[in-house]
Amino acid sequence: MIHAHTRLIAAAIACLVLGPGAIALADEATAAVPDQPSALAPDLPAAVTPPAAPVAPKPLSRQLANVRKPPPEPSIFSYTEAKGNALKIGFAVMLLGLLVWGWQLEDSGQSRKWRRARRVAIGFLGVMGVYGWFNYGKFHNGNFVHVWEHYHYYIGAKYFPELRYARLYECSATAEVELGRRARVASRSIRDLAQTNLIGPTDDVLANPERCKEHFSEARWQDFKQDISFFIGRLGNRWPDSQKDHGYNGTPWWNITGSILANLIGPASERSMFLLALLDPALILLMFAGIWWAFGLEIFAVAATFFAVNFPSRYYWNGGAFLRYDYLAWTVLGICLLKKKRHGLGGALLATGAAFRLFPVFFAVGPALQAGWRFFKERVLSAEHRKILVGAVVATALLVPASMVVAKGGLELYSEFAQNTEKHAQTPLTNHMGLRTVISWRPWDSAKHLKDNSLNDPFQTWKEHRIDNYERLRWLFIALNLVFLWGVWRTTRDEPAWVAAALCGVVMIPAATELTCYYYAFMIPGAFLMEKRREAGLWLILLAIGTHAITRMPIWDDDKYMWMGLASLAYGWMLIWALLQPKAAEARSPALAPALETAGASGRRRR
């Protein structure tokens, strides 16, 4: 009875948070897992069953009756990825038109003309932007939960004290052997997370099962096997490929929340995955509510539209996962709080976002550059920077000891995390983006030319070439980063702290880091800079539309993501250029224009 009530509550939450499309998902979450004998059956002969009674064959004409019928035509209202992308881009173009029209009216002194209708339309497009990221309720072709992601982050967080960063695939294989599937483990390859980070055979794992089991108590090992059994069945024929991904990479600070929730929610099940997957949508809704509160309707609509349209960070990658967007929510909300002059709490959230995924630290670097410059000039920190610093220090002071308690380890935890981070930094991926990807790219060294299926890791040669290319031009990478950093400092040194935070993150993360494509939702704060230059929002939407244009190019994925990364770098430099223009040429903020016009009219009346 209790479980029935739990399922009903989960269904209600899904309907409220995710919309009508979640009704079917709630039904799925309360249903039993479908039988998958091909995935779960151990390597044992099947039981002998008595032969079934012979059934008389149907006449041939009846057998062919259905074959002759053509398949039904899909409804014009049926959802496909192509239709969804077209709808998102169509809404984006409509928003561009509304914004430009509104700004023309403001510049001509007619800001009140159609104002209510324009605001309603812009608000509608903003809401559809948020909804559009969820593929308008279709999620992963009707499946809300990203099971692959839950395997990595639910298992990785729940058993982090035993697995750490190097033993996820090794221990999964050891557990699978004890589940009666030794032959299947022996016949496939897994990624070696501990040593080479390359894909290879499982011989060493099979020969040394105690290497994994010595880290578990007997009770925890049985729980682990039960959870692995669930994911083997749930992933089905995708399970072998899941063992070739890149493991669990949550930071020690993210692991605080991840580990506590994964252990509290109970064994891996449809219900537990569904409930954990609800957390990201709730945070995303909170994030966009914060944007509307801090920056107003137009900027909310631009940010939401970018989120929906941007191809690299689409729902496909991390939608329906376990807390993969918390870093984004805390970082964006931190900037919103800086805008509303809640500097202490804003600094705490910026520090939290950085701790949860590392690269968001560049959003905090902007205010830090300001603080350093002003201290150099005035020998004192401003009040806003003092509050930001205090908030960040308090958050860090809480997160560091908590991470060691949850991980049941000491300072060696951070050494292991640093090694894991360095390992991934030296592992090029076909969906990497950023300046390093651009510098290491060569048209003759693409995956199309270097992929070798005769190797255990078909991309090994391609990776080696990428690393060599980067090492030859490392000096250029450093020099360009210094130029970008100078541009950020020069642009924001006398601006409010929120401007420095937004610009530094949007510019420096593509320049200084090499991230997988799905993190590029971090570009959302580019919309905030419409407060200073309204074209910043137009360029951001055009950037998102441009990523779809790049996908139409007849090239391989590594080339496509290189071009998307280059476009993101260009957007950052365009922001610096625009903000460096003389103040007299600066466009009025969309949020401030009506107020300025009203003030001007009042002045004329007084005269």
Residue ranges and their predicted role:
Residues 530-607:
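Aromatic-enriched
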Residues 325-335, 359-362, 502, 521-529, ...:
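Alpha-helical transmembrane segments of multi-pass membrane proteins
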Residues 307, 318, 511-551:
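Extended hydrophobic/aromatic segments used for targeting, binding, or gating
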Residues 302-308, 348-353, 500-508, 537-549:
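Central hydrophobic cores of alpha-helical transmembrane segments
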Residues 2-17, 22-69, 579-607:
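Short, intrinsically disordered terminal tails adjacent to the first/last structured region
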Residues 58-336, 340-343, 368-517, 580-592:
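Primarily membrane-embedded glycan-assembly and transfer machineries that use lipid-linked glycans
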Residues 2-20, 25, 29, 365, ...:
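Cleavable Sec-type N-terminal signal peptides
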